[in-house]
């Protein structure tokens, strides 16, 4: 029996089961994708949790809800998911693996995960959401915990939003698998999967994490409008930010630090905290760029950059600029929620982060330039679609 589109289910990801939502289903006997997604729905900004529910207007700027807002309380992209066929196979989804074309499959969104983890899975990986299967889900988690306590290698993939280190999802194309050499073009950065006690800690903290509240960063309206423009340039106009940027993330952080440290006595505790915050922003940017800061259309460019000998010794903060750095501040509240910082430390960090956001706003005309975006070539567009 084919499960209904938009219904809830349990789906295997690694050896564990996670609650998921079925966004589309594929039945080879009917040679079609049962996508209950209507065209013409407002576009959804794919970065973090900021959602743009307005179509582009060349008059007044479209507005964004406050950072942290999510559509219908979920981070699924069903409002922005449209059926795209494979070349020469009009009834087969473009991103469905060849080996799955002859079996029932579901395009699922894992509850609480970023939509970059949405994927087609075979029906053998999907279970109905009922009491028996929920019991199985709990038993699998308990078995994983027991294995971790005994020091056995545990290869479970806990939800990516719950881990401080994560493994990347299985690539669906050859080009995506090439990206696994460095940070992937889709999904979190590739690091060694955690086993033993580390995996145990991940699982035990998973429930606690989901209960945490994100901090609310104040983002000026003109930077929210900047995010809307950025999203439209890339996803609607198929433009790319020229790389490497003349003024990089590293350059911007240096300018901010130079301006901010004038308020503090050299060597003071406040000056030390400022240094840590600046270093932390750079670290977060370098580690999260390939996983959560790119639109799909930009991933081929990222792949080319990471494989270029000219940039082999550079971090991403030495290549990318303000456009991608601003996207980080949409996701930072959720990333900070994954840490174990106490309330006082979070309050201090929040103050410095908002100082930096105001700095970006003050220097918007310097760092955010429309001419930084250029039209992608037809060859690039073909590569980005995996043709």
Swiss-Prot record:
Subcellular location: Nucleus
Keyword line: Chromatin regulator, DNA damage, DNA repair, Nucleus, Transcription, Transcription regulation
PROSITE patterns: MRG (PS51640)
Keyword DNA damage: yes
Domain annotation Tudor-knot: ranges: 100-126
Pfam families linked to this entry: MRG, MSL3_chromo-like
Domain of life: Eukaryota
Ranges of residues in domain MRG: 211-385
GO CC terms of this entry: NuA4 histone acetyltransferase complex; Rpd3S complex
Annotated family: Belongs to the MRG family.
Protein's job: Involved in deacetylation of histones, chromatin assembly and chromosome segregation. May act as a transcriptional oscillator, directing histone deacetylases to specific chromosomal domains. Component of the NuA4 histone acetyltransferase complex which is involved in transcriptional activation of selected genes principally by acetylation of nucleosomal histone H4 and H2A. The NuA4 complex is also involved in DNA repair.
Oligomer and partners: Component of the NuA4 histone acetyltransferase complex.
Protein name, as recorded: Chromatin modification-related protein EAF3
Annotated source species: Yarrowia lipolytica (strain CLIB 122 / E 150) (Yeast)
């Amino acid at each position: 029996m084919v499960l209904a589109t938009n219904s809830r289910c349990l789906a295997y990801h690694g050896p564990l089961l996670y609650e998921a939502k079925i966004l589309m289903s594929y039945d080879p006997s009917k040679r079609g994708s049962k996508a209950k997604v209507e065209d013409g729905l407002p576009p959804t900004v794919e970065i973090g949790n900021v959602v743009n529910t307005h179509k582009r207007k060349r008059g007044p700027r479209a507005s964004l809800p406050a950072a942290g807002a999510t559509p219908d309380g979920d981070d699924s992209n069903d409002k922005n998911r449209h059926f795209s066929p494979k070349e020469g196979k009009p009834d087969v989804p473009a991103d469905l693996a060849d080996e799955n074309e002859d079996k029932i499959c579901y395009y699922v969104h894992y509850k609480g995960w970023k939509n970059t983890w949405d994927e087609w899975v075979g029906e053998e990986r999907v279970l109905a959401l009922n009491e028996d299967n929920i019991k199985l889900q709990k038993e699998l988690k308990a078995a994983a915990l027991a294995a971790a306590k005994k020091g056995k290698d545990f290869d479970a993939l806990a939800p990516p939003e719950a881990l401080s280190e994560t493994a990347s999802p299985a690539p669906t194309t050859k080009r995506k698998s090439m990206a696994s050499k460095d940070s992937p073009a889709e999904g979190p950065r590739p690091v060694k999967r955690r086993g033993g006690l580390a995996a145990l800690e991940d699982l035990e903290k998973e429930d606690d994490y989901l209960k945490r509240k994100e901090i609310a960063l104040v983002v000026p309206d003109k930077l929210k409008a900047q995010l809307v423009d950025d999203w439209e340039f890339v996803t609607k106009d198929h433009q790319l930010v020229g790389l490497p940027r003349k003024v990089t993330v590293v350059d911007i952080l240096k300018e901010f630090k130079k301006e901010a440290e004038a308020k503090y006595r050299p060597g003071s505790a406040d000056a030390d905290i400022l240094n840590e915050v600046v270093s932390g922003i750079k670290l977060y940017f370098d580690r999260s760029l390939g996983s959560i800061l790119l639109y799909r259309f930009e991933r081929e460019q990222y792949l080319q950059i990471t494989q270029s000998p000219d940039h082999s010794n550079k971090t991403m903060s030495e290549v990318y600029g303000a456009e991608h750095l601003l996207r980080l501040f949409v996701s930072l509240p959720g990333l900070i929620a994954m840490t174990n910082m106490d309330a006082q430390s979070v309050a201090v960090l929040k103050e410095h982060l908002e100082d930096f956001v105001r700095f970006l706003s003050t220097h918007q005309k310097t760092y955010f330039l429309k001419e930084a975006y250029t039209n992608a070539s037809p060859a690039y567009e073909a590569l980005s679609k995996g043709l």
